[in-house]
Amino acid sequence: MQQYLDLLAHVMEKGSDRGDRTGTGTRSVFGYQMRFDLGEGFPVLTTKKLHLRSIVHELLWFLKGETNIRYLKENGVSIWDEWADENGDLGPVYGAQWRSWPAPDGGHIDQIANLVKGIVNNPNSRRHIVSAWNPAEVDQMALPPCHCLFQFYVADGKLSCQLYQRSADVFLGVPFNIASYALLTMMVAQVTGLKGGDFVHTLGDAHLYHNHFDQAKLQLTRRPKPLPFMRINPEVKDIFGFTFDDFELIGYEADASIKAPIAV
């Protein structure tokens, strides 16, 4: 994906060196946007191999509304381990906000169910929005949401999604986020009877950690390969009915993975 390599090069060449919460140091830019046409293939990096299993299981975990890493651990996914407490809990992170946002009357709002219903019943609405940024609960979260708000848009029988990501770890996080929200868009499109349109990724603080520079330079020497295609089980018509086996990535060829430390 040339769009991602362009982002990587832009941050390396134009970014400002700044301190950060982790003490690692970053080079960052503020405000950057990428667009991916889902009709051209599934936007997963080919200049380094990604662990698709982690991406799919994390998304299913979000959609379950869960905030304990037990499900992830049972399925061989360790990407949230560093932030969980001794019981595996993370506080009211993504799943809680997506599926169980606290309402003033003591009840809860299922933003995902409302989203799907809204797309079906009023596709032209400009209110197809899900937010994970809850100011009343952000201090209770092990890690405040980085990808914090997304909006869907219907036109010409296609469903597009725009994500706003306040904090974007360009080397480790962003490739996962692109694939995750592209997949979510395809899933929502299927259950609402639409085709996949564009995934638009808008970044706030887009940063490369200083200890990722060598890895970024290596990746920039590689050339993108043709995108694979994601096959989704067409029998699934409920957004909460998907399982891992409903997804098959066809034709994925990628260069070797590039290891890099996580800044916690």
Swiss-Prot record:
It holds the Pfam family Thymidylat_synt. Pathway: Pyrimidine metabolism; dTTP biosynthesis. NCBIfam families: PRK01827.1-3 (NF002497), PRK01827.1-5 (NF002499), thym_sym (TIGR03284). It catalyses: dUMP + (6R)-5,10-methylene-5,6,7,8-tetrahydrofolate = 7,8-dihydrofolate + dTMP. The keyword Lipid metabolism does not apply. The gene is thyA. It is found in: Cytoplasm. One of its GO terms (cellular component) is cytosol. GO terms for molecular function: thymidylate synthase activity. Catalyzes the reductive methylation of 2'-deoxyuridine-5'-monophosphate (dUMP) to 2'-deoxythymidine-5'-monophosphate (dTMP) while utilizing 5,10-methylenetetrahydrofolate (mTHF) as the methyl donor and reductant in the reaction, yielding dihydrofolate (DHF) as a by-product. This enzymatic reaction provides an intracellular de novo source of dTMP, an essential precursor for DNA biosynthesis. Belongs to the thymidylate synthase family. Bacterial-type ThyA subfamily. (6R)-5,10-methylene-5,6,7,8-tetrahydrofolate binds at H51, D169, A263. This is Thymidylate synthase.
